[in-house]
Amino acid sequence: MFKEREELIYDLIFSEITEYKINISEYIEDIYKYDRFIDDIKSVLKKSKVAIIKEKVDLEETNVIWNLKVKK
């Protein structure tokens, strides 16, 4: 069962939290397509005037972790 991408986007835009550790494997089935997932989220954030200050992607055997800091 995957988490809802829309809930993540809502949190990234409207939550007061600015630092996130996102396990992408909780949102998509094929973790090797993580770059497409990240690009989609970045596109939405840009349209919502949320700037990415810092980001790092950690690739693990079964997980892809996206560490993200945003400015709203």
Which residues does each predicted region cover?
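A short, conserved structural fragment
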Residues: 46-56
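Residue-level detector of functional hotspots within protein domains
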Residues: 8, 36, 52
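Short, cationic-aromatic polyanion-contact patches
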Residues: 56-72
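Short amphipathic alpha-helical interaction segments
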Residues: 31-46
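Short amphipathic alpha-helical interface segments
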Residues: 1-31
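Hydrophobic beta-strand residues in large extracellular and virion-surface proteins
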Residues: 22, 41, 51-52, 68-70
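N-terminal regions of proteins, emphasizing targeting and processing segments when present
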Residues: 13, 17, 45-48, 68
